[in-house]
Amino acid sequence: MFAPIGAPGMGERASQNFRSASGFRDLLVHAVKVLVLSAYQRRPCTSMLRPREQKRIKMRLKWMCLMKFCFMQNNYWDTQRRFTGGMHNVPELATFDAWLQHWRVVHWRLNIISEILIDFQALVRMMKNLAGQCHFDFYPVCTHCVQLVNNWYIAEFKPHLEEETEWWKDLVKPRMGNPVHEIEPNRKSQYVESRRIPPPLNGDEFANFLHVCQCAKLAFDVERAATEENFEDALDTLEEDFYDIDSTIPKRDLLAADARVVKRAFTLRRKRRPNRTSVYSMKGQPPVTFSASDLVSCLGQVLSTLPTVKMDREAIEDQQDHLEDKQGGEILTTPQFIEVLRKKKREVREKEFDDSTQGKLLPAEDFTLSKHDVFLANSVLDGLRKSKLIQRFAGKCATSTKITVDLTNKEEVVRYGPKELASEGFRQTFNVLNRPEYNALNKLAEAGWKEAKSVVLNLHIRSYLPQQMNAYAFCVIMWGHSSDAQEAALSGSYVYLGDGEATMLQLPLLCEYVGHNLQDFEAYKRSLVLSTVFPEFSGIADGKAMFGITSIEFTEYLPTSHAGITHERDSWDAMLRNHTEEKRRFLAGFNVVDTIEKGNRKGFSFPDFDLKAVPRHQAVVRTFEDQDVAPILSKAKSMRVKTFGSFRAGNIPVNFLGTPSNGQVASKHSVSENAGYSVGDMKSAENFVFTQLITVPAASTKGNVLAGVDILANARTTMSGFYMRWLQKGYIDTNLKLICHLPRAPFAGMSFFVLIDGTGYLAKDAPTSLNEEEILSYPLHLVTTSDVSSYEFVLDWHRYIGQVPFAEENAFLRPTLFLVACVSSTLALSAKVEFYLEAQSVGEELPRTLAPSPVLSYPFQNSFLEDLDLFLPPKRLTLGERETTIIPLSFAKSKKSGDAVLYSHAAARLAHFQGIGGVLHGVVYLVGSQLVASQSRISMWSKEQHIQHQAVNVHVDTDTGVAFDLPIKDAFYASSVYGDSGAVIQVTCLCSPMSPNAIKAPFDMIFKIRGFTPDAPMCRTINFTQRFGWFAVEPTTSTGAIKLKIWPVSNHLESEDMKVTGYTNAFLQMCQTSTMHFGSVIIHFSWTLFGGTTNAATAGGVVTIAEGFGPEEENFRGHCRNLSIYEGRATVPLELGTFAGPTPLKKLDFKYRNWIRFTTPKGRNISSIFCAIEVLPGFSFYGRTGSPRLSVVGTTVPPTADASTSNSQGGDEDIGDQYSAALGRGRGRGSRPGPSPIRG
């Protein structure tokens, strides 16, 4: 026990100890005991020490006491429970960094305490009596006092200070620009005022006891620290960092205290004392003890905590600046390096990441780095490294590690490559990623570091393109010392440049010998290169700055080859298995780890391309003003990079992604890499589905069906592995890639359409020929021997059907392909041609549901015009004649074939508009033999132009297939889509078609309209876009009872004694040209009476509108209304669909469906019945197909069960024959005999 206050001999004993050799240590112990006693009895400690003792001790103890004062609360609660049994009004202790800033404000401005801490007037008077010195043992440590003082300081000296908050998290997706309405931020300050009651100065025994425990623990810490080496020097240095000489005013900003300075005073070797020492006890209570391990834990919190206050955005952005100061590097322990990685991720930790471009990203709370992610887990070895026992007893350990963090690139700019270096529609550029400087590397080599391993490369991209621009790039980190792109490619990712920025954390794991790097430092500087592949962008000039990069490289230096604590990339699959269940941080991609990218819901199709290696023995192109550019060596081997859709579940080894495209640098002992051979995709064997032999005659006529390919039947016959998997799952779970195994034959002139019939509407008749209008109304893919890239295409189920087909039964889907000759042969082949059509499974696994998004949904928008894929009829130019071809923009008009009317999906979309303005995007294909050539100019104007006027207009000159973008230019600024007036596409022959003497074939070409970039003010819709006329019925005076039944499909009505008129409108055209449709509508009936022959006084009658489900005899009814015949109108809602949701365009014999029945017993009194359909928002369309053959509207057709004048009450009319979705009457294919049954 300590002596009571005022005990005799207290001061004399302290003076004697002060003069002895160990006096200072004893004096420290004595002074702390005095502080504890004075705190417990609430008496000033100055009355218990002499002035010279106070002066000697004051500066030595001040900061040491402050450092550990507030980290003792961890053990206070145990003490509380033992002595008091629990108390509810326990004051909340402040953290060390908050209390440290608080104490400095009080120490600086003691006179403001009386104004702020009103409840602590006695404490203020006591502190003022101490000659202006703020004594920590009297000052409360609760958060209440800390908050009061900090609020005063901020309001007095930092009025501009604003705490950074996460108010932007209230926005669901803050990527689409500023919100229209102002959003009140949900701000929550970091300084939250405590609601707990502050401890009173007197009367609360537990508060007094808690304060004593704090001082007692502090006394024990001071006694231990005083025995360490350099204790006095550390305190002197620490004191000079914060105060001027003979001054109590802090030199630094009070709210910018940095505990790293305080940390230097405690980076001393500490001796562990495992024994427990009793420092204080209360009367009648067990003694309070503190173990050495508790104190070490307390010091660990001090050393690992770096208190900072976030003031503004600039302060947050400055967190990266300290990385540049580490260019030379410093020796970091493993936990410290992990902390560096964590700090780098704090900027993006709370951001919202949805789906990566080709892989699913992690939620923010899972997106963290741990020791097991980057380093080998070895707790014993890590403990020895942290305690430095390895170096102390064995000198420099063979497994020691030095880690540096280098800001290698901060001003690098990636530019759009020159046109001269473009290849197959792509432009590849190279940018060197800087490495550590020569002097820094030389010092490391002199210090004994042998190897340098590049562990992590953090690449940040800042786009210079407009927001939401549909622009993508492929960035890959390459090893600069290999001419084989297969070996040089380390890691890479697709990047969407329309969202402003992107970050990629990659693991190159490139290890190099430091001595060799010094010998050939120029080669070392080019060891890591960023290669960027851009697709061709129209309108972007060569050398345009596309984005800037900043790269941060984490390098591990090793003294021996045995050293290293990072994960070795022995097996990507093993690393994936080790991290999948815990954090799933290894994602799908091109050896990409943690790809971070915003706004990845933008859909895009990045085609395959050849990736070139870094050129050898020449400077990497970094600017585009230099004229002397050395050519790329012909012996460089490129790699074919393919799409990554099928690899969403995991990482992709490099050798699965592509193969060399040429083999000039191949080993002569390797068969797979010999010159002249192409290495196949080794995963294609697993993706095989079926093959079918196709026979093409030597000469064919336009419209001839060369072959029909029933996809399910072929897969069922082949019984491949994928088909067995489809049977297990019950549906086709992937898209199909169709490959035509044709040779490169540009002079053969063979071309054909692949017609995609998802519902099997054409397949039921097994046609041998189709007319041109019917072919162009279906989705098509053009295959021509003049372009080998057309030999492959992907059959996307969601695009062409709207859902995945069932594996075994056709049901309402029978996906069938027809190979149809697009033009008549003008240059006959010497013999028939036989080739195989192969199907492979590609892409990610598809869900067994509808497509995630429909192809179109109401209300109609201008953006729906961007994706049309409309083929125009082939154009033929005669040899030796210079002709001009005019193509009007009347793409919404229907096409007639005999007595039938045909629509395409693109025409149905355009039918919603009167006219459009903007930019037209198209492609022209050469479908004939390249033995016949011509030069053409393509432009657009309101009428045919002279060649001189055409030259100054926007135009495209071409002699082969080319894509073009033409702005719509017309006197009305817009063009009619129905052909009344407007702009035209003009194709002028700059050179008439020419060929060798023996070749008399004409020049054939086909235009494809990809879509329009609409100019919103110039896209004028028709007057009605939500309400359309459906049909009209005109009874006669001989008509009896009228009974009309409306089914939940876009059907038509037929009658033998009533004239039925089906109206043409954009909505029904969309229903006809989509595989499925689904949504809610409102049916509007209106009718009129005969004006001349019907007497209104005696007419009478009632109209009944009933709703029901299934056969009528089961009386499963809904609402029923009886209306007077004089009311003239009625409205009833209806949902178009089936039990499965969407309504397909195929006959389904479903009895149990919703229906609406319109009946009246006196049909002769009604002159006409008009029915309109109002489409409600959300009505959706799925898939694309061609419309059925529709007869001319307004004629009378044979009777069916859809409309009847009989009084039959039977249920036969419920048999489902309404799924034809026809707009008129008169089925039949014209060229084929006999009427065609209802579709399906």
Swiss-Prot record:
Keyword Transport: yes
Region: Disordered, residue numbers: 1193-1240
PTM comment text: Specific enzymatic cleavages in vivo by the P1 encoded 3C-like protease yield mature proteins.
Pfam family, one: Nepo_coat
Residue ranges, compositional bias (Polar residues): 1193-1210
Molecular-function GO terms, alphabetical: structural molecule activity
KW Endoplasmic reticulum (keyword) present: no
Keywords in alphabetical order: Capsid protein, Host cell junction, Transport, Viral movement protein, Virion
GO terms for biological process, alphabetical: transport of virus in host, cell to cell
GO CC aspect terms: host cell plasmodesma; viral capsid
Family: Belongs to the nepoviruses RNA2 polyprotein family.
Note: Virions are comprised of 60 copies of the coat protein.
Protein name: RNA2 polyprotein
